[in-house]
Regions:
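Acidic catalytic/metal-coordinating carboxylates
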Residues: 83, 109-115
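Short hydrophobic/Thr-rich beta-strand motif most characteristic of the beta2 strand and flanking loop
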Residues: 75-82, 90, 221-227
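Hydrophobic/aromatic residues positioned on beta-strands within the core alpha/beta folds
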Residues: 4, 9, 131-132
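Conserved acidic carboxylate
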Residues: 10, 58, 204
């Protein structure tokens, strides 16, 4: 059911929480009949058969190729950008369904890109998955929590997680993926049932790890405490 677009009708303070868990869009309470009609029209337009658009923002050519090969299939069109400025230009030229963003870019930081996306009226709801190996400070961690939908830390199982996170925000149909990608996702989710409603304490002095682990565990149905 992850491919089904969910339209939230909620309070504004719940917006980021819902969007980070894959909600398609939201309408702020109290709403009007016109607001609900616009929301339904957005879902109707989004659900129409078409190839999804994904933008990969990464200055390293080998990393770009690796990400493109990992995520690519006939159901999506993948574009790439090497700089923050190029990424913003591309995003403003065509509507995109999801962005994979590295925080280390040659012309500006990934944080600046995220802030410009947030502040642009037509881009503010584009889901951005940060894919980075950068060690985060506490301040950077707090900024990411308010700007990005998800953070995937480069390392063990990061390809599976990146495929999983982008599939969620692109609303990709599991059965439509090639067998090797289905197997990657199945392996990642096989143990989820045992984790539902369990409480876990995450203790780490690296806020990057805390952010990444908390996001993954909460999405698996766990209650997360951090220290």
């Amino acid at each position: 059911t992850r491919h089904i677009p969910v339209q939230m009708v909620t309070l504004d303070e719940d917006r980021q929480h819902g969007l980070a868990r894959g909600a398609f869009s939201f309408v702020t309470k109290p709403t009007t009949s016109e607001g609900l009609e616009d929301a339904l029209n957005r879902i109707k337009e989004y659900a129409a058969p078409r190839r999804r658009r994904l933008l990969v923002v990464e200055d390293n050519a080998a990393e770009r190729m690796s990400i493109t090969e990992l995520l690519g299939h006939e159901d999506i069109d993948i574009s790439t950008a090497e700089t923050g400025a190029e990424a913003l230009t591309v995003l403003k030229s065509l509507p995109y369904d999801c962005v994979v963003l590295d925080l280390r870019l040659p012309d500006m930081s990934g944080f600046e890109v995220l802030e410009q996306i947030r502040d642009h009226e037509k881009l503010t709801d584009v889901p951005v998955v940060v894919f980075t190996g950068k060690e985060l400070t506490a301040e950077e961690d707090a900024r990411l929590r308010s700007l990005a939908r998800s953070v995937v830390v480069k390392g063990v199982e990061s390809p599976e997680r990146l495929l999983d996170e982008t599939s969620l925000f692109l609303h990709r149909v599991f059965d439509g993926l090639p067998p090797e990608k289905q197997n990657m996702l199945k392996k990642l989710h096989d143990s989820d049932e045992d984790l539902q409603n369990k409480q876990v304490l995450v203790v780490d002095d690296d806020t990057r790890n805390i952010f990444a682990l908390s996001s993954v565990l909460e999405r698996r149905g766990m209650r997360v405490l951090t220290a």
